[in-house]
Regions:
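Non-catalytic DNA-recognition/assembly elements of restriction-modification systems
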Residues: 1-18, 32
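Residue-level detector of conserved, well-ordered beta-strand and adjacent loop positions
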Residues: 6, 28, 88
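Short coil/turn segments at secondary-structure boundaries
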Residues: 18-26, 113-115
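Short, basic/aromatic beta-hairpin or loop at an interaction surface
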Residues: 26-40
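A short beta-sheet element
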Residues: 50-52, 56-108, 116
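Extended, charge-rich, solvent-exposed interface segments
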Residues: 120
Length: 120
């Protein structure tokens, strides 16, 4: 059975105040570890007032250099940079299943292809 990614998840669009974050709850591409190894503590917080929100169970994927395979399933709520995509599972989708799909090497290979080579 084939389906579109939009059938199982959507991008989270909410914003969160940076004042409510700390270096443990802020995620950027810099503190996401390559090869699907999770995250480390951020070295600093952004200087803007609001940033992208994520919720526990969301899947965060670095939007920069996808061949590094930076991905993390959130274990708590927080905020992230705009260079991090936040995928929220739809109500009919298991959050672990969404992580499994997005952490698959085929997904990262597809993301690494030039846009004109991608099949819908």
């Amino acid at each position: 059975m084939k389906c579109k990614l939009s059938d199982i998840c959507s991008f989270r669009k909410g914003k969160i105040s940076v004042d409510g974050l700390n270096r443990s709850t802020y995620i950027s591409t810099e503190n996401m570890l390559p090869n699907k190894c999770g995250i480390t503590e951020a070295s600093s917080l952004p200087t803007v007032q609001l940033t992208q929100e994520y919720k526990k169970g969301d899947v965060l994927v670095s939007n920069i250099r996808p061949y590094f395979k930076k991905i993390w399933k959130a274990t708590y709520d927080g905020g992230c940079s705009n260079d991090v995509l936040v995928f929220a599972a739809n109500s009919n989708t298991d959050k672990d299943f969404l992580y499994y799909i997005l952490a698959n090497d085929d997904f990262f290979a597809w993301c690494s292809m030039p846009i004109y080579c991608r099949k819908p």
